[in-house]
Amino acid sequence: MFRIVLTIAILATAAPAWAELPVAITYLRLEVDRPPVLSNLDPVPEDLGVAGAEIAIADTQTTGSFLGHSYSLTLASIPPGGDLTTAAREALKTSRLILIDADPATILSVADLPEAQGALLFNVSSGAENLRSGDCRANLLHTIPEDAARTDALMQVLQRKQWQTTVLVTGSHPADQAFAEALRRSATKFGITIAAEKDWTFDTDLRESTMDEIPRFTEGFPDHDVILVADETDDFGRYIEHNAWLPRPVAGSDGMVPTAWASVIESWGAVQLQNRFEDHALRPMRGLDYAAWAAIRAIGEAVTRTGSSDPATLRAFLLNPDFQMDGFKGRGLSFRAWNGQLRQPIAVVNSRALVTLAPVEGFLHQRNEMDTLGLDEPESAC
């Protein structure tokens, strides 16, 4: 069983009667059973990702209505454990432009469907390296940053601040383990030392005992400049800062966080996007919202420039070295031709302010400085 909801035909101005070019987009989502966490202060929004797609459709239709382009967005949301490929087959009958919000294995299963050959798919949720390397697919582009881009951004900041020695605390969930591995690779890449590691194994409520338990947990660490936290499920990281044995900054999944988007980004016209999103969703924009927004804006830019909704035509345009689009992050966004990853600055933020945008000044690249973040062409098996 799966649920299909017509989310939006047009959020903004209705398409004129003479519209000749329909552009049908589907958002495929595999819902997730979230593991229990210590705090519910920041619940995951039910419309995470979807809300970003909705405002992107509104933004895109504003221009499209003048050109005879009519955009529509359909949401197919599958309960946890359901079969997203069944919904994908149904969606591909009427839409050849698909956003996928799912785990890496499910994304690949959709991309490999016979019905998906010739379609254009956008991964808006998974930062897994294999999707950009050995398991890349010609019909799959990525607007969510890869984990390696986020961790590379963080290590550039640590290197710039000369915080050379770190320790690492890793949670028990697969997403935590994957992020920890990305942190290790990035640390090696940028010459940052991880002097010691510990696994987070507590399964009791620490909210009333953090001042006792966290110092004991971190007391045995050798001297360090920063505590790295791999806690992608938002379970324990918030309790490490200000409770550790040594007074050190926290970075990674909590503290100083590398992310695609955050509510503290204010420059480069970002406030306009933030305000439009909050007016629509009644909450701040998150990274997955931004990835969905970027995917539809990329589609809209390609349709506007080519006058076509053909997936092959749009893909060729998006992968052209001359393609750029504005992403409200100070640099033009473009796609890497070798693995379909959207090049984008990574915001390194704390809960109240933007620390910086990576790539950090001084980290150079022969082609594009944003290629210092994540898998560069020689590193990808794509």
Stretches with model-predicted labels:
Residues F2-I8, W18-C382:
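Extracytosolic ligand-binding ectodomains
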